[in-house]
Amino acid sequence: MIWFTNLYVKIVTKLIPSKPSEEENETHLKFISTGMLSTAELSILQAHNEIVLYSQRTQRMLGLVRELYHETDEAAFVKKFSRIQKYENISDRMEVEIATYLTKVADGRLSNESKHQIQMNLRIVSEIESVADSCYNLARTIQRGHEGKVKFTDDVNANIELMFNLVESAIVQMSHILEASTLQISDINKTQNLENEINNFRNQLKTQNIVDVNDAKYPYSSSVIYMDMIVECEKMGDYIVNVVEALADSKLYKVNAK
């Protein structure tokens, strides 16, 4: 009976393939890979579900950037940077595939509401791709600092961490809003408040950086990497708030005053 058991195991293994890794899943579309559905409304809903997933993947990309910033092992640094590059390529492809799908839906007969939905989602896809671009730009700046053996002071590291926290809060909020069926005034306000915090903190750090460089607290080469990271984070905040504004501007989303 042992031979039969072994044969059974082989058959089951073939019939039930192993669960793909998270990284393998990242390369596949989940909701629109099978093509358009029976109605434009359902197809647009599927595209929006894909956009929610797109947002969540971009959020994970930012998490990888934060890991890269703290990585000190050379081999691990190279591996993490390669993963971020992979995420960037996936992001570019997702933008094109979602936009192409929405454009095909737009070729059919649509209500005015469906037309507005497509326009809104196309705008959102473009902004999320810009968020991913900012993540990649941050990774490249970190790589430049790594190659130049740039060392930051404890204060600079703390400031970068605070800025990362603000941007991460903003991107988490963006994903939350995209998932929600109703847009709350409180969610819009929270996004705008985070954007204001990011802008104000950027301005504060730029001013302090000039003082610190003049006081020789760190070399100018370090300040360039430092400020490039801060400015890129602020740009990311702009793209994130643009996503929320696209939803708020749309007549399709019911806005509750909460």
Question: Where does each model-flagged region fall?
Answer:
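Cytosolic, long alpha-helical scaffolding segments
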Residues: M1-K258
